[in-house]
Amino acid sequence: MTLTITAQTISITSIEQLNELSGENVKLCMQCATCTGMCPMTAEMDLSPRMVMHLAQFGMLDRLGDSNTCWKCASCHACTVKCPRGIDIAKVMEALRQHVLRTNKNYIEPSALPAERIAELPQIALVAAFRKLTS
């Protein structure tokens, strides 16, 4: 992926918003990629956790919002446990999900699910999915 960074693409406001939502300082990331190596979901993501942190450092939240990565994150905290800088990357992913949902963009429509599928799924899974994927 080619990424061009200019003074116009860097959004200080977006960086501050992400830091506030997550309670983390994304600028502390040194791009070691330990998070990517530890993540069990990396193969399913279109951007690696390291790339998410890289884009977050420039405040490119719109680009991150178009990615499936924050939705594929299992919030298992494997990345957080091994991060040499102590960044809770799972919190950053949750903050990205919250940012996207605040724009009223849903990733799942409850009424579109077939009734037989709803009947066979555990209720806790449905609640978790709706909480995570709808605004």
Segments and roles (model prediction):
Residues 4-21, 44-70, 76, 89-121:
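Ferredoxin-type iron-sulfur electron-transfer modules in oxidoreductases and energy-metabolism complexes
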Residues 9, 39, 78, 130-135:
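Short histidine
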Residues 25-42, 67-87:
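Cysteine-centered iron-sulfur cluster-binding motifs in ferredoxin-type domains/subunits
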Residues 81-97, 128-135:
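A broadly tuned preference for mixed-charge, low-complexity surface segments
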Residues 113-135:
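Acidic/histidine-enriched, glycine/proline-rich intrinsically disordered or flexible terminal extensions
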